[in-house]
Structure formats: structure tokens, C-alpha cells
Amino acid sequence: MRWHTWLLIKDINPMTASKPSPRSRKDAAATAKASTDQAAAGPAQSPATTPAPPARKPSLKKANKRPEGQWAVDGHEPLNANEVVKAADDGLHVRPRIIDIYSKTGFDSIPEDDLQTRFRWWGLYTQRKPGLDGTANATMSDTERSDKYFLQRIRIDGMPLSIQRLRVLASISTDFGRDTADITDRQNLQVHWIDVADLPEIWRRLESVGLDTVHTAGDAPRAFTASPVAGVSANEIVDPTPVIAEIREKWIGTEEVSNLPRKFKTCFTGDPSLDVAHELNDISFVGVRHPELGPGFDIWAGGGLSANPHLAERLGAFVTADEAAEVWHAMILVFRDYGFRRLRNKARMKFLVEAWGVEKLRDVLEREYLGHKLADGPAPEAPTEPGDHIGVHDQKNGRKYVGFAPTVGRLSGTILAKVADAAEKAGSDDVRFTPYQKLLVLDVEPDRVDQLVADMEELGLTAHPKPFRRNTMACTGIEFCKQAFTETKAPAARMVDDLDTRLADVTLPGPITLNMNGCPHSCARIQVADIGLKGQLTRTPEGETQQTYQVHLGGGLVSSNRDDPGLGRTVRGLKVTPDDLTDYVERLTRRFLEQRADDEGFAQWAHRAEEDSLR
């Protein structure tokens, strides 16, 4: 692989790496001096800031403000333990040690810094020891909660999965992962129960079909989400596939972008359905038509959820497909150099956007990194079709694509192998995952659609799902995740089946999305679901610890059913136990149907309803 050869033969300084921006061409010594001077004066400010009042003594508080670890302002001195580990050795460099040493000497030989930090640069997390409940999160360290097996995240980047690729993924699951395989809401595949001894063979199989795991975790550019119908959609504005390929070829797996303040998430879509949750990414490229410049992308920045949710904001800038890769590269360097590194819970791109505003972000991007202005451009138009692509749809080439709904993204290697067989039988060589934990089979001849739908139905994958099967997502949960407090996949699957049965007597006016997360990190996007359930531990009246779920209601992203994105409201004091989840959601849904005004969706009702109606 290109990145593996590269990292073994070349040591690139992250400030002077390939394709230098205008900023990175500056003299290093001058930059270091300027950084030191600026650090003494405080964080960098835009040219438009108000000058200091004359003859006024500087504020002692401001003068003594702690550095935030911005490389371009404070220099490169590590300000926390994670930054020390990254400065000592890039996460990319652990790969040869995994292949040549740890796979032979075993789990117990792996040093802590590699195991709990650098392994992540290759998509590896130690999974949770079986049997540990949520209280262990407070009483045991990360290492103490770690089993001797790994979650392996496989980078897909929205790419088509050929039948050959799909069979390789299936073989990795069945041969090494105890038949586990989960589609994530970033279109990746996660396999559990991975032994370090098997990693060289797993990576060999992936690389033989053009797949890899690089930067699927860690403080690096994470795997991209992309429209799962890129290049085939009958309504597509612009195809992002060449842009993604250019970025992967030039920068993914290079040291220039492998030491960021935190993770950096990217999405691309040229489909008018807005099918990639663009409001939740660090940078988003959304297809639009410029009145003079033609098709291209509208740029958004600063999205993310977790405990401090922020929705991405438009920069108001337009780029063509030919410019998009360069702009992505420039933006990630802005984040690398100016992102806040001192506190990890304040180190995401959204906090830089919050501190600067999009006007300053765009100015720094253009002036310091691109060296030219970007064109102003239009905002995306409101979507008129659902973005989950479930069901049968036309392609631009006259063929069909069909979207199927696994239950909360859970598959298996056995099922993946049978999906490959069904797709091949239908004449397809193109299967894709979606950002909603769904699966598409593309390039199907019209006369083979019915047989494909029937074959997939036998695998438990339906093209015509009932409402909650279609609109429910869940994270990994306490089954494997060390951060989780509660279960997710199993209770969500039970809820889906029960709710679709219990509510078969009603007709919903639109989709009600139900997202379940096992902790506050919101990997399953709870704050932007109609009904979001966040796992937590609470006390019973008798003082016993129990699993419960905090409820968020009325969140959502722009869709064919919603004009504006927004976060859900929480219901004060409401804690729903696992046994009560189905009853609660059924009760809530029926109240919505009873109390809604004409043409009122669930989110609108949830935000105006009295709290008693939401309990």
C-alpha cells in the first residue's frame, strides 16, 4: 500500500509536508519566533478585532491566560498526556510493530501508549471485558475495562463494495470476528473479537481488494461519509467520487494530517436528498448549482454532537469539484494548526468555529492556506425525497438500486456472504452502506429487482420495512464499548419488533426517528432524532444502581419532512428503564397522534407539548 511504503521510507515534518500551503512555506524559524511572541500576548485574533484602549494597564487575567495548545499560536509543546504520546511517536508508526512484533508476542506484550492510543490510528479499540456493568466506568481505568480482543473498524469512505470486496469482509468476520459485523452510521463496518495475532492476515485481505483501516480512529481525518448513490443517482447535482479518490490518494495515511487536535469528520454529497447528515461533520461538501459557475459544493464547518452539540454552519463559500480536494486539505491544516489541544473535551473543530465564527474561519482559510478567495455561493435547496434510499429507485443509466434495512445496522459475516450471492445473482457488482446503518444494492436490471427483494427478505433484510424498523439506529453499547453505561443493540432490536407490531393499527403522518446511545458521546446521534435515548446509570429509591435512558425529543436534521435542523428537548426528571422503553415509546406515539395539529410533525409537537404529555 502507498501509505505503508511512504511511512517506512520518509519522515515528513507535519508543518512542511507534501503540497505546502502558503502558510507552511513560511520560514520555520520565523514562525517559531512569531508563535512564541503570540503565545505571550494570548490567542490569535482576527484583523478586525478592536485595538487595546490607550494608556490602560493590560488585564492581569488576560495576560496570564493559559495557552490552548494552538500550534500556530503557542508552539508545539504538548499540554496533556495524549499530546505527549502523539509527539513521542506518530500513530501511523505502530503498524510495523503490530505486524512484526505484537502479532507474534501477543496482547500482553503491547505497551500502554501503543495499546490505548496509537492502535486507534489503525481503527483498533480494545473492547469491553464481558460482564462489566456500567459502574465499572467510574471504578476501573480504561485499561482495567479492556478485554484482550479488539474492535476493528474498516474504512469504506462511501466506496462501492464489489462482490469480491463484500466476500472479503464476510471472511474477516467469520474467520476472525466470531461472525460479528455492524454497519456504523458513518458507513464503516465494525468487526469484534479480533485477536492481535490475526491483524496481519486481516490487513492483507483488505489491502488485496483496495480496502484499509488507516485513520478510522484517533486524532486524524476519519473515514468519509458520502452519498451512497454517488455517480448513479438520477437526480445527482455533482458526483463527489473523484474528490474522495483524490484526497485518499494524496493525504490519507500521511503524517501531515495524522496529528490533529482531535478527530476530523468529513462528508460529501451531490444528491439533493441531503443524505449524509452534513450538519454533524467538521467539514461538509454539499452539492449545489451555482448560477454562473455550475455544479459544485457548498461548504459547511463545525458540526458535532457528544456532550456539547453544535450544528455545522455554512461558510457561504462555493467550490467546484476540481477545487474541493485542495479546500479540504487547507481546512484540515487550519484545524491542525489552530485547533485547541490543551483540553481534549474542547479540541474539536466545532469549538474553533464557536470561538472564531465562520467569517474569521473563512478568512484564515483563504488568506493563510489557500492564498486566494473562494466564490460566494448558494445554499442547498430543501430536499423533497427521503435520504435513507430505502426501497426501489431509478438510476441515471436506466437500472435500479434497492435499499434494504437491517435491524439497527447489525449483520454478520454469514449474512454479508449471502448478500454478495444475492447481489451477484441480480447482476450487481456494487453494494454500499449508508449513514443510517442501511445497505443498498446498485446496478440491478429492472427485471431482476423482484427476485433480489425476495432473496434479501429471506436474509432478514427488507426493502419495505415498517416505520420503526426503517427509522431506528443504535450504537454498539455496553456489549463491546468501554464508554457505554447501557445496552443498545439488543433492546433497540426488541423495541423495533414490538413497536411495529403494537402500532400496526395506526398510520404515521411521517417518519419518527428513534436513536439509542449507551453513553453521552452520541455516536447514534440522539440529539437529532425525534426520539433520542441516552443510556445512563441512576439510583432506585432503595439506592440500587440501575440502567435507565434519558429522553431527548424533537431533534432532527434537514430532510423532506423538516425545513431546519434542530436539537431535541429533554424531559426533566424522566428516566426510562429498559423494561419500560417499548411502553413509553408507544404511549408517546399515540399521544402525538391524538394531540397533533393538522400537518404537524412529531418534532413540532414534541417542542410545543406540555411535559406531562411527554412522560
Language-model region placement:
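Mobile "lid/hinge" segments at catalytic clefts and subdomain interfaces of large enzymes
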Residues: S258-V358, A529-E594
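Gly/Thr-rich phosphate-binding loop signature of adenosyl cofactor/nucleotide-binding cores
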Residues: P53-A170, V364-K425, L440, T462
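Generic secondary-structure signature for well-ordered alpha-helical cores
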Residues: T174, R178, S208-L211, I252-E256, ...
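Arg/Lys-rich low-complexity patches in intrinsically disordered regions that function as generic
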Residues: S18-D27, P54-L60
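Small-residue-enriched alpha-helical segments and adjacent helix-cap loops
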Residues: P43-P53, Y149-G294, E326, V402-Q546
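Long hydrophobic segments that form regular secondary structure
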Residues: K396-K400, T407-F433, L581-V585, T589-Q604, ...
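Terminal amphipathic helices with adjacent charged low-complexity linkers/tails
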Residues: A197-D198, R205-G210, R336-Q395, P435-Y436, ...
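Tryptophan (W) side chains
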Residues: W3-W6
